[in-house]
Amino acid sequence: MKKDLEGKIILLTGGASGIGRECAIAYVREGAKVAILDRNFEEAKRTVKELGSQSCSYQADVSEPKGIETAVAAILKDFGRLDAVHNNAGIVGPSCPLHETTEEQWDQLQSTNLKSVYWTTKFVFPALVESKGAILNTASMVGLLGQQDHAAYVATKGGMISLTKAMAADYAKYQIRVNAVCPAGAWTPMLEQWAADQPNPAGIREYLDHIHLLGYCPRGDVIADAAAFLLSSKARFITGCILPVSGGAELGYKR
């Protein structure tokens, strides 16, 4: 039986660890070849080694356009084409209200989480036109609902959600689909570190279980399964979709 992503070439940013790593595993499992782009090259190489010959790693910081441009050129040279891009790289930023956020923190969040989508799209667009490909963005439920003491981060994810819809409208004429997944929470190294840095780590874990109506905070593989679906031909008539992968958190969300 043919796999859902058989023969697809997927560029995945932030694929070395966390949700990105789980997505890389899912894409390879479904038959894709994955080009992992990450600033942590050593971690990316370890992930590629685990995945085998169906993946390659490329070093770039998504907040720096030159690195993205160079990596995209290398990927196209190595693979010959590109069928999908998953903009997954991101950072969480400070736990404070907007007026306490420094300009440096604001700019870094915007560059990494949101402006990076602009740069990847700019450099991969011709290849996606040729392949009639797909773009997937990793957003967040907080981009839809807001969250206390995370205004700068929320702004980037809210912007990504609106951008996803606008891109879907712009690129439909090229048969390029654009969608987003919205986790509420998922245990990753980044979230583990964030939780550990809070005044009450045990309380944070209880909170993260509580906000999901299904009763637990998942691992990244549940996000990866949804992402693999949205990049597959099974989702061929889905574009502009902001898909909650949230265990129903939006139905009873507590800030």
Placement of each model-derived feature along the sequence:
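Short, small/polar-rich loop/turn modules that mediate ligand/substrate recognition or access, typified
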Residues: 172, 177, 238-240
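Active-site helix of classical SDR
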Residues: 121, 156, 164
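C-terminal helical subdomain
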Residues: 180, 188, 202-234, 238, ...
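Residue(s) in the substrate-gating loop at a strand-loop-helix junction
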Residues: 140
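Alpha-helical segment proximal to the catalytic Tyr-Lys
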Residues: 126, 169-173
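Short C-terminal tail/terminal secondary-structure segment
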Residues: 92-95, 145, 228, 239-255
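Substrate-binding pocket helix/loop in short-chain dehydrogenase/reductase
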Residues: 96-98, 102-108, 208
